């Protein structure tokens, strides 16, 4: 992002929602930190990343009913753009095509690319979250997200067993 390696995944998504002022996310993050009596910097740890998975799940679960209501309302009103039955029939498929899909997987951004020739997959590629997070230094010699995370001063429970770094 703008020339810098960025971590992807639940913590990144929760922090983005928090920074954007998403009310439920701010409430959940603040109350979690308060209940655990932890400072904000605790988010950038194994505990913080685990908590982010849980908090993100709560935010998504809370939104699902509204999304379902909108979908059903649109279908009842005749808006069926989310489903095109004709495109589900193999006879309607082109002999050659290219496709790309992006989504947020539990560990972070996921991209899939496909090339179809003679109605068969000619090439398929997935760029998985670990590709983003574990990427090497870039052309400007900036560290990838994992390396950058290890450069900070981590407080270790036992300096002879730095498992926090491995888990985070």
Regions found by a protein language model. Give the residues of each.
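Metal/cofactor-centered catalytic core regions of large enzymes
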Residues: 1-168
């Amino acid at each position: 992002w703008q020339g810098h390696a960025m971590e992807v995944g639940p913590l990144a998504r929760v922090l983005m929602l928090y920074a954007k002022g998403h009310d439920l996310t701010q409430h959940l993050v603040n109350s979690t930190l308060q209940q655990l009596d932890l400072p904000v910097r605790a988010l950038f740890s194994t505990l913080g990343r685990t908590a982010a998975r849980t908090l993100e799940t709560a935010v998504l679960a809370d939104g699902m009913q509204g999304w379902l209501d909108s979908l059903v309302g649109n279908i009842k009103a005749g808006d069926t753009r989310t489903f095109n039955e004709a495109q589900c029939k193999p006879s309607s498929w082109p002999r050659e095509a290219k496709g790309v899909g992006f989504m947020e997987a539990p560990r972070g951004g996921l991209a899939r690319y496909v090339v179809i020739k003679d109605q068969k997959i000619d090439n398929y590629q997935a760029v998985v979250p670990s590709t983003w997070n574990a990427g090497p230094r870039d052309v400007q010699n900036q560290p990838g997200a994992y390396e950058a995370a290890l450069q900070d001063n981590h407080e270790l429970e036992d300096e002879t067993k730095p498992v926090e770094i491995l888990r985070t």
